[in-house]
Amino acid sequence: MYKRQATPCAAATIGAARAETFLGRCDRATRATLSVIREDPGNVSAYAARGHALCLSDDFDQGLKHLKEALRLDPDGADAQRAFRRMKKTADALTRARESFKRRAFEEARDAFTETLALADAPERSPLFAEVVSERAQALLRLRLHEEALADCDLAVAAREDHKRAYYVAGSCLIALGRPAEAAERLEVLLKMDPSDETTKKHHEKAVFETRKAKRPRYYEVLGVSSVASVPEIKQAYKARCMEWHPDRHATKSDEEKALAERNFKALGEALEIMEDPMKRKLYDEGYDKEAIAERAEAARRAAHRGG
């Protein structure tokens, strides 16, 4: 079969496109090679370069079609042959990874995502790299390998700063690691990029909620009772603890000890107020802090007043 030679101008464009692909700027590469194909529909190198760039954009359907076209035009083309075999194996590994994740076989998914990255040899700024590491992060999150998942999320965001899945997974990991304030900060960055995104809002609200929850006084510990203690048990514990921490019993002690007694005595009063009220206690057990509980209690009071 006759192999059409690229013009010097087309060859330069294709060379630049390959360089863009190497840097992960696959969108530029696909645009450049498309312009060559439109001018010269028989350009083998353009099809091969465009096919490779499309695969690294996570568009294997179109990418493999272009590589096949390059092979149709030049069946003996070694570069296109190698690229087609490698990208086909990459696509198959990625399909296995995604199917494993759907089946909740998370270890298999993690391994298949790792295999995908090895086969693709994708630049770290390419769309495929960002997508695969973010999906692997999801599998790692399900395996409770939170630090590893966070590392993958960082890679995904470095490749694409607005990669939503990476932000969401990172937020979940940080909350699981007891670092909800960091989760809220990260998600706030994404929220500023797209303030109207409802999913991002929900993830951010959860992180803020968990941050406030982590800062709450631990009222059960303050009272020295279990989370299933009855109201009479709570009141009995309250009286005993008040005897222990009443400021009058610490009047002759150091300023530091007196301040501690005052804080603990105040916390006991707050704990009793919430724990002896069924609605407030339920809200506390659900994770709400003192301010949020007061807001909801007031809203319920107003609603009851209107209903009456």
Language model features: what each stretch is:
Residues 10-11, 44-45, 78-79, 90, ...:
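Helix-start (N-cap) detector for alpha-helical repeat units in TPR-like alpha-solenoids
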Residues 189-192, 196-271, 275, 296-299:
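N-terminal J-domain/J-like co-chaperone modules of DnaJ/Hsp40 proteins
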Residues 6-7, 41, 75, 121, ...:
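Short coil turns that delineate tetratricopeptide repeat
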Residues 1-2:
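Short, small-residue-biased leader/transition segments that mark boundaries at the very start
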